[in-house]
Amino acid sequence: RNRQEIYIDKKNAFYKKMTKLIKGLLADNLNLSDAYMLPNLSGLEYVFTGIDAVFIWTKGGYNIGRSKNSYPIFIEILEKDKKKWEAFFSDFRIRYAFKNERKKGIYFVISTAETIEKEYCQNMPVLPLGKTVEWAQKYRFNFEPALEMLDKAYNLKLGVKYKEMYA
């Protein structure tokens, strides 16, 4: 499905008022729904990657390595936009890092690339399914249940059968 480019006029009075309102609300009480939608307000290109690509492609069916006390959200951005993203997250007072380091609460872990490959799943820009599967296979021990879900949902013919072992 073709996507239209979105242009955000940051000088628009309505945009300024809404941004001020949103900043105040998010700074005090960022929830997961808001966090996953927040990058859309940047007007910059990005894609959910890593654990979040798996989370999105499994439609929330598989989530790992996070808790209510520490919830990283993984995105990839264009290298040329790094300073703009830093300003964006700082402006919204949202925690972020360019390496995977534990922080409290909801925060973004950002990787950079010269170009971004993306597909859309549930209207969210995400690492393409094939690349997500390749990534998950590198960490098969952690993602075997997710690989089985993806195989079943998208008929990938991976032949993955996850089985829990009890000692």
Where are these regions (language model features)?
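Short, cationic-aromatic polyanion-contact patches
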Residues: 2-24
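Short gly/ser-rich loop at a beta-strand->alpha-helix junction or flexible surface loop bordering the NTP-binding
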Residues: 23-105
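Alpha-helix boundary/capping detector
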Residues: 14-17, 32, 159-162
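Generic structural signal for residues positioned in beta-strands
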Residues: 5, 72-74, 132
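Short secondary-structure transition/capping segments
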Residues: 15, 44-54, 148-156
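Hydrophobic alpha-helical interaction segments
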Residues: 79, 83-167
